[in-house]
Amino acid sequence: MMKEKAKKYLSVAIDWLLYLSVAFLCVSAVWLLSQVFLFSSFSVPTDSMTPAIVPGDCVLVNKVLRGGRIFNLNDAFDHKPLEIARLRGTGKFRRNEVLVFNFPYPERWDSIGFDVMRYYVKRCIALPGDTVEIRNAHYRVRGYRGELGNIDSQNSLARYMRSERNRDEMIKGGSFKAYPLDSVTGWTVQEFGPLYLPARGDTVRLDRHRYAVYRNLIEWEQRKKLTAHNGCFYLDGSEINYYVFTHDYYFMGGDNCYNSQDSRYWGLLPEEYIVGKATRIWTSKNRVTDEIRWDRVFKKIE
């Protein structure tokens, strides 16, 4: 009799263990799929997006808008060339939206790479097909009359750079000259562009100027070296005069214009590198006192 009861209890315990194991696996699978395809969370360590996002904020990122990404994690960790696929999304990214993306220059400034563990959060200033400029530290997109980025910060930077002494300090600190750091453009964070953002299918005729601003994009798309010699351009040794882009590109800017490593310095961002749109601050912790900033919890990012 006792043996039968023991067997019964053991059978019930095993059943419950199996049920709990299956439930745990199901919850884990749902959580993992949600992280890949629906949403994810990122902690922000710097002040480059102040005041919209401050150090210690944890932002919730919507991946549904443009679609979740699929790529080989092993290749990403080994820094091998990646094929990144994106699921069909519900919409498109817009100017002034805050986006999270993989930083495209983790190793070298003259070559696009991919670091699966290094994420940036910036505001989208310009879209594929836009022509972006910076005039007196203020962002402009041709044909668009709305404000772009943090206007107060741009006003402050413009006033700061009126002083020749301040400009000299920025030059010495390496924060005045802008992408592509080439004498053919001479662009700075004060006066930049115009720069056309290629969209998939766009054709450009190569010249010295376009070579300077698009070389790294073409090399990333083709995985071949683009060189210039005596006014001619060679892709992996074969002369080319025109190039058709196969990807879309974005121009990103931090709200804190004084301290933001963004497209002003490193150039254009391939769409495949974008994780998604930062929608809310789901929690925030003061890094000095370790206290929760309750006034920022679940705050909408605008």
Residue ranges and their predicted role:
Residues 18-37:
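Hydrophobic membrane-insertion alpha-helices, especially the h-region
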Residues 37-39, 292:
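Residue-level signal for pocket-adjacent positions within structured domains
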Residues 41-52:
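N-terminal signal-anchor transmembrane helix
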Residues 3-13, 50-302:
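Soluble "head" domains of membrane/secretory-pathway proteins
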Residues 40-41, 126:
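Cytochrome P450 fold signature focused on the C-terminal beta-domain
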